[in-house]
Regions:
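Short solvent-exposed beta->alpha transition segments
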Residues: 31-32, 47-87
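Internal amphipathic alpha-helical segments of the cytochrome P450 catalytic fold
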Residues: 46-47, 122
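Short, low-complexity N-terminal intrinsically disordered segments enriched in polar/charged residues
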Residues: 1-43
Length: 131
């Protein structure tokens, strides 16, 4: 459990509670999960990169898998420079968000998308992709 998916009283927020929040409040709860993922990737820190992933996604993103991805994109594109929020999508069983993402060695604009779900009593990243 992390501070960003908790109510002010310290208890974990459910997906239904998150869905009741305003877009700004919802972003404030979910953006830190993306911060962890991106900073973990930039620093090649597997534990930080996957700390907010579901078990399913952790099985896919192994230390070796992350190392290979980082080696490839950092050589070609650099590291993450900044992101701009684009959209938020509320679903019955998940929340999806998209951002425009920029890298330090590229002028291209990339799309970062992530899907958040409730698993094991906390909000986690179930899917994420950069393209």
């Amino acid at each position: 459990m992390t501070d960003h998916d908790q109510n002010p009283d310290g208890r974990s927020m459910s997906l239904s509670e998150l869905l009741a929040l305003s877009d700004e409040e919802l972003r404030a709860c979910l953006e830190p999960l993306i911060d962890n993922m991106l900073s973990g990737s930039a620093d090649r820190d597997h534990a930080r990169h996957v700390q907010d992933f579901t078990t399913r996604l952790k099985v896919i993103v192994t230390q070796e898998n992350l190392a290979a991805q980082c080696e490839d994109y950092q050589k070609r594109l650099g590291t993450f420079a900044r992101r701009e929020f684009v959209a938020l999508f509320r679903r019955r069983a998940s929340i999806a968000m998209t951002w425009r993402l920029f890298f330090t060695k590229s002028e291209d604009e990339f799309v970062l998308e992530a899907m958040f779900v409730e698993r094991q009593g906390r909000i986690q990243i179930e899917h994420c992709m950069i393209f």
